[in-house]
Amino acid sequence: MQSEAQSPRSSQICSTEPVFGGHAPRRVSHAVDVRWGGTLVTIGGAAPVRVQSMTNTDTADAIGTAIQVKELANAGSELVRITVNTPEAAAAVPAIREQLDRMGVTVPLVGDFHYNGHLLLRDYPDCAQALSKYRINPGNVGQGAKRDSQFAQMIEAAIKYDKPVRIGVNWGSLDQDLLARMMDENGARAEPWEAQSVMYEALIQSAIGSAERAVELGLGRDKIVLSCKVSGVQDLVAVYRELSRRCGFALHLGLTEAGMGSKGIVASTAAIGLLLQEGIGDTIRISLTPEPGAPRTGEVVVGQEILQTMGLRSFAPMVVACPGCGRTTSTLFQELALRIQTYLREQMPVWRSEYPGVEKMNVAVMGCIVNGPGESKHANIGISLPGSGENPAAPVFVDGEKVKTLRGEHIAEEFQQIVSDYVARTYGRAAAQN
């Protein structure tokens, strides 16, 4: 006969308070300040995890690029990277910066350099000054002896103009000389590593080795951010775990070429979420392939939602909504959830300054009586719409208390007004007190 101690029932009882842990403490890294005018965005140190993005315009088109940068900044991107690949693009950078400043958009610009960055930074000093940060790829900065010289020229430009850099390694453009040497060394081992491990090590050595060379050239550790981007979830997690263990530089997270739609979102969320949960990562970029005609700002929203759903930051009020089931044959709750979520995001550019704290608000839009009232009570504001066969009434809860029951054809409009009034009443008062 099974003893009391061995019974399944008793094994579920905990005699002491269990430890329910959240995400791990944040990895300690050097704080890197990225500035433009009066705007300061700190990456690493005690700063919050930053969300950044990249334009897909032709940088030589100064007007088109400035417009997209503004859209990304308005969506919440704290840094925006632009391609600087030609003399025409480099010449346009000061005009882009000037147009943004004229529009009141002070988001720092990051110049993305490959192959010829040393020449562009030398020949276009106004471009070098207008950028707030440089991205350098050690894999294509030059070959052989030229690599060291051209890398040094870019670091010297960063020192001259007092700009931080991201040394960004990518397995699609990894330094082939380094990889070949490491493969040869691996072949000579008594017990060779797997090829995948050699690739990981090459990525890490390229990043850290380049960073240490930059330090030798005079660039401070507080001016360097590292990244090692790959396109596989488990590959990214493995590389960053080891990279974070072996250096104290601030780290930029991103799953390169994540893809389109739900696949890209899921892959990026899985990889970045795992690392953030372990306290690894100081800034993120979601590399989504936008569908034709879709706004570029989608990658910013996904990045924000990753951080907010993990409890790391708050950007906009969150809408909790049930998935629906056989009890919810009406689409009313789905339509209302979408309407409220869209409304909240549209209001945030104004609310962010007028109603500080509103970004932490939770709104529940539920579809039936099973979880509707309970979930609505947990939110700041909640509504429980009637399911199939239920009384055609929708109780509304504010701060856990039922305050009203809505009926009829204008439930959506009335609930939206209740939300708006709550924001003004609750967060407007907080703003006045501050």
Curated annotation (Swiss-Prot):
Q: Where is this region: Disordered?
A: 1-20
Is Acetylation given among the entry's keywords? no
Secretion signal span: none
Task: Give the domain of life.
Answer: Bacteria
Catalytic reactions of this protein: (2E)-4-hydroxy-3-methylbut-2-enyl diphosphate + oxidized [flavodoxin] + H2O + 2 H(+) = 2-C-methyl-D-erythritol 2,4-cyclic diphosphate + reduced [flavodoxin]
Q: Which GO terms describe its molecular function?
A: 4 iron, 4 sulfur cluster binding; 4-hydroxy-3-methylbut-2-en-1-yl diphosphate synthase activity (ferredoxin); 4-hydroxy-3-methylbut-2-enyl-diphosphate synthase activity (flavodoxin); iron ion binding
Give the compositionally biased regions (Polar residues): 1-15
Please report the name of this protein according to its UniProt entry.
4-hydroxy-3-methylbut-2-en-1-yl diphosphate synthase (flavodoxin)
Q: What is its EC number?
A: 1.17.7.3
PANTHER family, per this entry? Answer: 4-HYDROXY-3-METHYLBUT-2-EN-1-YL DIPHOSPHATE SYNTHASE, 4-HYDROXY-3-METHYLBUT-2-EN-1-YL DIPHOSPHATE SYNTHASE (FERREDOXIN), CHLOROPLASTIC
